[in-house]
Amino acid sequence: MTISVQTNASAIIALQNLNKTATDLQGAQSIISTGLLINTAKDNASVWSIAQGQRANVGALSAVQASLNRASSIADVAQTAGASISDLLNQVKQKVVAAQDPSLDTTSRAAYNTDFQSLLRQISDVVNNASFDGANILNGSLAGNISFLANADASSFITLSAQNMSLGSSIITIGSTASILTLTASATVLAEVNASIINVNSALGDMGAQATEIQNHTTFVAKLSDVLNQGIGNLVDADMAKESAQLQALQAQQQLGVQALSIANSAPQIVLQLFK
């Protein structure tokens, strides 16, 4: 081997190797700290681009899940209120049927009418308070359906139908001023009560079916989001056991490289020894 005081080829090579090891070590440390094999576009442009696209879809699905969760809450509140209304209508029917007794005196009939009016007010209170986040599908404030996001590109929607259960509506046909003070009036109201009970129970069935549809779709969206996250992980996640082993190997190489550079740098000293 030629020894020169002008050019130390061995030291240059050792330094190059040490620099490469340092670069590789920095990369390994970055992978371990982030847990990502592909963290930026420079790591692998095509894979990074695909992963970013899927991350965008996952983010959009989070918005879909939020919309569907709101739909479920609105439906749950409406169903709870609807069940209470159904129970109140059963009590209303009891009072109206009792008022059909021709033997009742005026005082007794008035007492039944007072109870009847109280129950109607309770129905109105339930209807008016069946709101979630400003949405009430029972009080007639919504003319049709409420639409909620169903997919990541906002091109598909799932709907929750308004069910107007206000007094005097097409579902509860009993008017707010209805009275059972007379036999004739109570007979008219009884027909309205019977129709209202049927209508409310039918509306509750529709709401239940829609709530189930919303819940099923919410479950699907959550699973889809999980699958996409797993797919992203398959693309960019690092094998931590492998990377840990690689880090240890690079650390050993770095130590050896430092020693090699030290040895190479000491070679020119041999020239000085020749002149002693």
Model-inferred region functions:
Residues M1-K276:
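Primary detection of the long, small/polar-rich alpha-helical "axial" segments characteristic
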